[in-house]
């Protein structure tokens, strides 16, 4: 194409100008540790799923109640995968109920809440459906509506936000009842 002065346009400049008009998106992996500060969860491992539209949080023992005429839900969360040792209790206002189709094709009516999510130092509101994800690989699923226009997903990598520090297990103390070590070396006379 030519501009008004019959000169060729530099395609590289056009692409560069187009990139400048869009905010730069940060990259995240297909697995990330996210925080849900409003729910008291410092870190929960989430699967970043570009194939899922909505986001879901593992929740069980759901009890609905009214607070000043508004529907709320109280629930429990096991934030760590493959263990029920730690339980967090939380409550949130119910935004609505939504019919969600699982990856197996089954539909389920789930309560939807809005809460803050934190990833790579960025905090924003996200809609979460509450469902029992005990049998699923991840306690949280972050669907594309949650990260759209905020992040690009590198499906081949994980944990761009880092991983939480693991607590070191204390080394076992030597048992005082143990027999002293025997030296089996022999010396010749």
List the model feature ranges, each with a label.
Residues 1-16:
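Short, Lys/Arg-enriched N-terminal segments with co-localized hydrophobic residues
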């Amino acid at each position: 194409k030519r501009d008004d002065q019959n000169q060729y346009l530099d395609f590289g400049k056009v692409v560069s100008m187009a990139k400048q008009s869009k905010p730069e998106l940060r990259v995240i992996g297909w697995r990330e540790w996210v925080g849900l500060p409003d729910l008291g969860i410092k870190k929960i491992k989430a699967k970043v799923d570009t194939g899922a539209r909505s986001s879901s949080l593992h929740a069980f023992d759901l009890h609905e109640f009214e607070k000043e005429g508004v529907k709320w839900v109280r629930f429990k969360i096991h934030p760590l995968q493959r263990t029920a040792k730690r339980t967090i209790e939380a409550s949130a206002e119910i935004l609505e109920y939504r019919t969600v189709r699982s990856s197996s094709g089954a539909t389920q009516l789930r309560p939807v809440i809005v809460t803050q999510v934190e990833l790579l130092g960025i905090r924003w509101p996200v809609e979460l459906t509450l469902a029992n994800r005990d049998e699923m690989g991840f306690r949280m699923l972050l669907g594309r509506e949650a990260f759209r226009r905020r992040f690009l997903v590198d499906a081949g990598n994980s944990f761009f936000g880092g991983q939480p520090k693991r607590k070191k297990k204390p080394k076992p103390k030597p048992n005082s009842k143990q027999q002293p070590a025997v030296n089996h070396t022999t010396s010749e006379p």
